[in-house]
């Protein structure tokens, strides 16, 4: 993972950690369920954004490198598996 992408990923993970801790506190405080759910949706969106950043970085680096090295089939199999798992 490139340094800039890694820094962005780590920053977003810290944000997600903090957000989840906040959700935990809300549940412990018996906060209204709808308010807790809104925060869990925000966490999900943050994770989806994180996944997008990681995937874009992977496509720009590892996938390009794999194709240049002639590992087309392995790269495509890996991307197909990732798609299957992410569905």
Please place each PLM-identified region on the residue numbering:
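Solvent-exposed interaction patches of small proteins and small membrane subunits
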Residues: 1-87
């Amino acid at each position: 993972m490139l340094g800039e992408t890694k820094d962005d990923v780590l920053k977003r993970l810290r944000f997600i950690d903090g957000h989840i801790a906040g959700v935990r506190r809300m549940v412990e405080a018996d906060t209204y369920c709808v308010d807790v759910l809104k925060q869990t949706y925000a966490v999900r969106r943050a994770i989806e954004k994180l996944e997008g950043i990681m995937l874009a970085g992977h496509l720009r680096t590892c996938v390009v490198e794999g194709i240049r090295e002639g590992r087309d089939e392995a790269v495509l199999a890996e991307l197909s598996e990732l798609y299957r798992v992410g569905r």
